[in-house]
Regions:
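A solvent-exposed, charged loop/short amphipathic helix patch at secondary-structure junctions
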Residues: 79-92, 143-151, 193-196
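C-terminal/domain-edge helix-coil "capping" segments
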Residues: 23-55, 157-166, 170-220
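Bacterial N-terminal signal peptides that target proteins for export
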Residues: 1-11
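Solvent-exposed loop/turn segments at secondary-structure junctions
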Residues: 73-75, 127-131, 187-190
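Surface-exposed short loop/turn segments
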Residues: 102, 106-175
């Protein structure tokens, strides 16, 4: 009986700590992104991950090739990397280049030349959170942490002490420079994804994989 009375406040207290610790930062209209002035609040089902977006009607079938600019790391005053080391930012940028190249290549022919029927895609990393070492993994085995992660998984939310990545995407018609699509997003693994909890950047990398797949899915 005493153990049950003690366990309830402990679980409740842990959940309160999780709610406070995992609120995280949300992407904003970054001042140094070219398409920022055209972004509008997203009221769609994906608004929690994509709070701001812009788009015009596009017949994506008209485009058969794509130019992917080198993924850049955003250095504006409103960047959201916290105390992440520059080496880790560079690692994520390289991984993003690989993830978006691989996924765009499944839908389009990759090219370095602009022209009719060619898209130009710009991806700019604007923020990231590393997984809290030991704690992030422990939450998958802790009663309160597992409960929290289970709820977050259903809601499509971020796991306890899990990492994430934020970035801006701009898609242009390379021939005339028209902005076709743009958005800022925060991506992270499913809250119950245990493998993504191991390694400080694993969750952010998983987020980039998911984000690259999501972009291509919107171009069909």
């Amino acid at each position: 009986m005493f153990g049950q009375r003690l366990a309830l406040p402990l679980v409740t207290g842990t959940l309160s700590l999780l709610l406070a610790a995992c609120a995280g930062v949300q992407p904003v209209a970054y001042s140094g992104i070219d398409a920022t002035h055209q972004l509008q609040p997203n009221h769609g089902d994906d608004r929690n991950k994509v709070p701001l977006a812009y788009g015009i009607p596009v017949s994506w079938s008209r485009y058969t090739q794509v130019v992917l600019d080198p993924v850049a790391v955003y250095h504006g005053a409103d960047a959201q990397f916290g105390d992440m080391k520059d080496d880790d930012k560079t690692t994520l940028a390289r991984y993003a280049q690989q993830a978006f190249t691989e996924n765009l290549g499944k839908r389009f022919q990759m090219t370095n030349q602009s022209g009719p029927g060619v898209l130009r895609v710009k991806v700019t990393l604007t923020g990231a959170e590393s997984t809290t070492l030991l704690v992030g993994q422990a939450m998958h085995f802790d009663i309160a942490g597992n409960l929290y992660n289970g709820v977050q998984a259903v809601r499509g939310g971020q796991g306890a002490f899990s990492g994430s990545v934020s970035y801006a995407v701009e898609v242009y018609d390379s021939n005339d420079g028209r902005l076709l699509k743009a958005y800022v997003t925060k991506q992270y693994p499913n809250a119950m994804n245990l493998p993504a909890a191991f390694g400080s950047l694993s969750a952010a990398k998983t987020g980039l994989d998911k984000g690259a797949e999501a972009l291509v899915a919107q171009m069909h």
